[in-house]
From Swiss-Prot:
The keyword Coiled coil applies. This is Transmembrane emp24 domain-containing protein eca. It comes from the Eukaryota. InterPro entries: Emp24-like, GOLD_dom. Residues 134-164 form a coiled coil. Residues 1-20 form the signal peptide. One of its GO terms (biological process) is dorsal/ventral pattern formation. It is found in: Endoplasmic reticulum membrane.
Amino acid sequence: MRNQFICLALVLCTLHSACGLYFHISETERKCFIEEVPDETTVIVNYKVELYDPRSNGFMPSSPGIGMHVEVRDSDDKVILSRVYSSQGRMSFTSHTPGEHVICMYSNSTAWFNGAQLRVHLDIQVGEHAIDYANVAQKEKLTELQLRIRQLLDQVEQITKEQNYQRYREERFRHTSESTNSRVLWWSLAQTVVLVCMGFWQMRHLKSFFEAKKLV
C-alpha cells in the first residue's frame, strides 16, 4: 500500500509540464515551440522581452515600442490565438483537440532598432500547473484542507486526460502502422506483377527472336 502511494505521488509530481527557459532572437526572427496538450486543457504562457544594450554589453528591459506577436495553432493547424502583446505579458488558451500545439513568437517591430538582439524569457504551464490555487482559495473562500482536496481532484482529472491522450496517440500510431503496412503490401504485389509481366514479355521476345533466327 505504501509503495502504491509513493508511485502515485511520483506520478502527481511529474505530471505535465511547467517549463522555464530563455532564448535569443533578432527583431525580425520567428521562434516556435511545440507542446503536446490533451484536449480541454488550459495552457498559460508567461514571457518577458529584454533588449540588448551594446553600451553595457548586457540586456535591459525592452523599449515600450517593442511587443511580441503570439500565434498558437492546434493539431489541426487551426489558429486558436493570434495577438500582439507588450514586452512582458501573460496569455492563456484552452485546447479543444488533443495533440501538438505550436506556439510561435516574434517581435512586432520592423527592425526599428537595426535588428537588435532580444532575449525572451518564456514559461509554459500546462494543466493543473496553470491554475493559481492561491487565487482560487481566496475567491471561493476554501480552507487549507478543501484547497488540498481541490488540487488532488484537479490532478486526478489531469491524469485521466493524459491517459485518454496516450490512448489517442496509440490509436493514431496503430492506424498509421496499419496504413503503412497495407501500402507496403500493395506495393510489393504491384512489383511482383510488374516483374512477372516483364519476365513473360522477355520470354515471348526471346522466343520470337529465336524463331526469326530459325534456332527453334
